[in-house]
Amino acid sequence: MKKLNLILLLMLSLIVFGCKKDDKPNDETTIEKLKVSVINDLHGALEEENGEYGAARLSWLVEKERQVEGQEVLLLCAGDTFQGSAVSNYSYGLNTLKVMNHMKFDAMTIGNHEFDWDLSTVLNYVDGNDSNGEADFPFLACNIIDKTTNTIPQYVKEYEVVDYGQFQVGIIGYIGSTLESDISASKVANYDFIDPVDRIGELAEELRAEKGCELVLAMGHDASSSTNIRIAGFSGNAAVDGIINAHTHTIYEDTIKNGNGDNIPLTQAGTAGEYMTEIVFNFDADQVSFDEGIAFNHDMSLYPNGVDLTVQQMVNQMTNEIAPIMNEEISTAGRYVSKSSVCNWTADAIYKSVDCDLAAINSGGIRQSAFPINEGLVVTVKKIYEIMPFDNLVKRCQVKGSDLKNILLINDAVFSSNVEIVGSSFYINGELVEDNKMYTFACVDYLFDREISIYGKGENIEILQLLVRDIMIENLKELKHNGQRWLD
């Protein structure tokens, strides 16, 4: 790796470049090793349940590493952090943020699910206003462009520099340039995700030449192999020392050769805190340089007795506060319930609850991890949050029959059961769809916004203030009131 002049580095280390120094060692501390601990796609999984191991176990492992003499820990999160669990969603991510502050995270990359409540909701946590909750760490993205200003959004940083006295570490954040399509179009309409690669090279060079960073990491909410290869291709000061991936919920601890000929770590750690990445960099104080990083993914299931009692108490208090709502028993499974059956049932629930001719959801909105559901299971509000963790609204419009036929062929759309396709013929309530007739169509907003065939050709478009999850809950309550079981 690049060798820095010791005298120059020590002079630069006296200057703070957006760093948090309170918990970092002074210049007299001898650091032999830096461990970079990373989680990605946490999705608000604070509790230990359903095969997820919880924030208390993650925090225990981080603190265990922090106690090792001669070693420092850099704690990072690669996005999709807040959205996805009852305890996190109910507070718009604030509960997760409080736990992360306690764990002393150093930086977080913005992921596609940070847009689910509008990006502005999440950015409130880095706006400097303590009254709405504030992160003790920055949110990073060098390639999200606000169309109104043609710059990165206010309160977002391109990178963070963490100062350890003997050396500085730069972390560059980015989001996959193709991930706009994974966000409801209305939530991302004011933003562009540009190709991050050139900017990462520029920032890496700036971090080394101007900020005195010996180590530079690229942390992306992305797992594009072509992007990884291009980022790794930089040499000289523009080279990075590790690439952190996210988004696909996969698990790997690979290496890739950078433009300087070094084998650098390339990692991702699954989802929901099931794994935690650890990248070890050994520091040579005489040469003021790092050896090549070595990556390892901790399987958190191997630490059943690991618990940070303070975090456990925090999470218990959070869950207890919402327990009267989340633990309400709203139905009982009348048979074995699969994901596909819930997709069909949910489309029917929207059709029943909204004045329309037909309804649809996207199958990806129902999460496979919530299944199986066995006959006799008591279904709570919390269980519906597991099944449908996203705060999707219903949209409604008028669609011409000729356009509706194309809509009915969308691959991952699940339509209400009053829709039937026989060969090349389309039926609604047993009647043939007529090309020139207008039909009222209700649809989950993600699918509605994504499909130009709907968004571009629909008329009289309405955004109904109805969450799909709330429609599911109310329909289940009605079944219970009528003495019926779910999908009996």
Q: Positions of the model-derived regions?
A:
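Acidic, metal/ion-coordinating pockets
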Residues: 25-301, 341-349, 398, 462-466
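C-terminal motif of bacterial Sec signal peptides marking the signal peptidase cleavage site
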Residues: 15-18
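Catalytic centers of hydrolytic enzymes
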Residues: 26-33, 44-47, 59, 67, ...
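Sec-dependent signal peptide recognition
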Residues: 2-9
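Bacterial signal peptide processing site
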Residues: 20-22
